[in-house]
């Protein structure tokens, strides 16, 4: 078996994508963009045995300096989105060998832990991966099967959504795909939308993030805008398109129009657009933190199809991981380790209720 971590410029990365059903999150261009804005070194674990392959895009990051560890350790994680392992192997035993090879190569690279976000549409089957690997299911996501007929697609849309879409059309709102003239307005409205919904910090992005995303992804990125009958921009969404999968990436609505829910019209039109272009799936994603919240219920109004979002938490070097967690706990005695947070030593320090910082 050939197995090693490769860089985005390695031709084998592109060869895998040419042979496999994949998503935009597997593209080297996406990982490069993520590295710039999330931090870390863009890499992918690559393994090949016979005609089978296994690819896992990650960002390799140095350990937090506050831990004061002098060893050349680091960790690796999936970037924002749904990269996850990509393979053409469907045999559980051989997949387990591929995964074991990934852990071995990570250890040789002094990677202490791996945090992998699986793609809900391309997840691995259930595997026996040992006690140092935890596979956690977080919740459902919503997707549209674009192989369905127009009638089936329309029937799957919740009646309340259909009513509001008809009202928007009657009032003269319209959708234009790839109208990049409104992109700057979208970027401004995105920040205001995040403020309005009290989004957590990780959902805020700089202006450079958006412009770099457009430059880096090029034809794989699409922008849909909603305008009034008078031409005023009121809402916009970013979509990615790769490997027959369209992802609903980011969305925003101008404050004064958010009660009209123009994004419902935008998504209905975008689903039809994606189907006309020959795509297989339109993935709307899930709720915040994969919860079945108001965001999830909004998305669920477009389709009855569900998939599951899960993560893989891998302790590559258990002794080092235990030591790093102990060191973190000593440095932050007022903050209990949060169950389920991985890797634990990257948890932000917050005093327990009633204690001063």
Functional labels for PLM-detected ranges:
Residues 60-82:
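Conserved acyl-donor/pantetheine-binding loop and adjacent beta-alpha core of acyl/acetyltransferases
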Residues 2-67, 118-259:
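A conserved beta-strand-loop-helix scaffold within acyl/acetyltransferase catalytic domains
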Residues 40-42, 108-111, 279:
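Short, high-confidence coil segments that cap the C-terminus of an alpha-helix
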Residues 46, 100, 209-323:
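Aromatic (often tryptophan-rich) hydrophobic motifs at membrane interfaces
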Residues 76-125:
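A gly/proline- and charged-residue-enriched helix-loop-helix capping module
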Residues 114-115, 176, 281-285:
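Short catalytic-loop micro-motif centered on adjacent basic/acidic residues
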Residues 81-92, 147-148, 251-260, 288:
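A short, internal acetyl-CoA/4′-phosphopantetheine-binding micro-motif in the GNAT/acyltransferase core
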């Amino acid at each position: 078996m050939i197995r090693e971590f490769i860089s985005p410029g390695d031709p084998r990365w592109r060869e895998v994508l040419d042979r496999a059903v994949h998503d935009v999150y597997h593209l080297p261009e996406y990982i490069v963009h993520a590295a710039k804005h999330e931090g870390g070194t863009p890499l992918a674990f690559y393994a090949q045995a016979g005609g089978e392959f296994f690819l896992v895009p990650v960002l390799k990051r140095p350990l937090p300096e506050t831990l004061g560890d002098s060893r050349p350790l680091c960790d690796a994680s999936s970037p924002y989105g749904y990269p996850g392992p990509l393979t053409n192997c469907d045999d559980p035993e051989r997949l387990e060998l591929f995964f074991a090879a990934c852990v071995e190569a990570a250890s040789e690279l002094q990677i202490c832990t791996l945090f992998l976000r699986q793609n809900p549409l391309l997840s691995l089957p259930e595997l026996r991966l040992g006690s140092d690997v935890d596979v956690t299911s977080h919740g459902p996501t919503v997707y549209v099967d674009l192989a369905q007929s127009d009638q089936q697609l329309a029937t799957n849309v919740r009646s309340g959504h259909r009513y509001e879409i008809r009202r928007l059309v009657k009032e003269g709102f319209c959708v234009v795909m790839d109208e990049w003239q409104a992109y700057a307005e979208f970027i401004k409205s995105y920040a205001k939308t995040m403020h309005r919904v009290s989004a957590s910090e990780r959902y805020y992005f700089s202006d450079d993030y958006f412009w770099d995303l457009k430059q880096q992804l090029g034809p794989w990125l699409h922008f849909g805008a909603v305008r009034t009958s008078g031409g005023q921009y009121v809402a916009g969404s970013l979509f990615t398109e790769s490997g027959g999968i369209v992802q609903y990436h980011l969305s925003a609505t101008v404050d004064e129009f958010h009660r009209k829910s123009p994004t419902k019209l935008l998504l209905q039109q975008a689903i039809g657009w994606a189907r006309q272009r020959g795509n297989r799936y339109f993935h709307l994603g899930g709720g915040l933190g994969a919860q079945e919240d108001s965001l999830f219920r909004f998305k669920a109004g477009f389709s009855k199809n569900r998939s599951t979002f899960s993560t893989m938490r891998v302790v590559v070097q258990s002794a080092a991981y235990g030591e790093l967690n102990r060191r973190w706990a000593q440095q932050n005695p007022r903050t209990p380790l949060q169950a389920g947070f991985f890797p634990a030593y990257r948890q932000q320090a917050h005093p327990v209720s009633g204690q001063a910082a």
